Amino acid sequence: MNSLKLVVFDWAGTLIDMGSKAPVEAFIALFAEAGIAISETVAKAPMGLGKRDHIKTILKNPLVESEWNRVFGRPADDYDVDRLYRSYEPHQIQAIRKFSQLIPGAMESVSWLRKRGIKVAGTTGYPRSVASLVWKEAKDQGLELDANACNCDVAYGRPSPLMIFKVMELTNLYPPSSVLKVGDTIPDVMEGKNAGCKTFSVLKTGSGWEGETSRKSLTNEFELVGTDKVIDSVADLPGVIENMKGY
C-alpha cells in the first residue's frame, strides 16, 4: 500500500456496537410496530446500506412481501417506505443508547494511525440525527475522528463512493489510492472499490459473524466482491498495515 494517508472506517460493527446490534433491534421493532414480524436474519441482510434503502430491501424479502400482503391486503409502495422511514428514527436512537460501546482495539488502532500521520474518518448509513448521537457516544468514550460523513450528506449512499469522496474533501487528502476503507459489510467493500480505494473487511465484530462456523462463508463473501484483506477486527489493523510494504 503506497503512501497511506487516510483510513475511512464504518461505524457500527467496525468501531462501535459489537455485532451491529443497534440497527437490527431498531428494524425488528420498526416492523413489529407496523404489524410485521421479521427475523434477525431478515433485518441483517441489507446491512451497510442507507437506512431508507435498508427498509426497501427488507420489504422486497419474499417472506416480508407475503406477510405485508396478508396484513394490508396490498404490496408495499413508496408511501409505505416513507412512512416506515419517518418512524424509524426513534427506534434507532433508543437502540444506539443501548449499543454504543467501542469495539476493543478501536481506540488503540486510531491512535496508532495518528502517530504515523495517517488521518482517520468515518462513513455511516445512519441519517444525521442518528449519526450525531453515534459520534457523541464515541466521543464520550474518547474516540473522535478527523472527519465524518453520513447518508444525508450525499446524493447517494453506499454502494456509491460519495461518502468516501466527502471525507476526502473534508480532510483534503487524495488520491483514492492513498485511502483505505475498513468495514464489516458487503456495501462497505463496494463503497471502497467504487471510490478506487483499498478495502479491508472485518469478520468477528460485524453483523454477519455467527461464530467460527461462519468464518469460511463470510470470508468467501467478502473475497467474491473484491475486498483486499479480511481481518478479525479493527484491533488487527496496525499489525496488518505494518506488514504491508510501503504503507
Explain the meaning of each model-derived region.
Residues 1-4, 107-115, 127-247:
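Asp-based, Mg2+/Mn2+-dependent phosphohydrolase catalytic module
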Residues 2-107, 111-116, 132:
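N-terminal helical cap/lid subdomain that shapes the substrate entry/recognition surface
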Residues 46, 123-125, 182:
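Structural motif
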Residues 99, 123, 156:
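Glycine- and other small-residue-rich loops at beta-strand/loop junctions that grip anionic moieties
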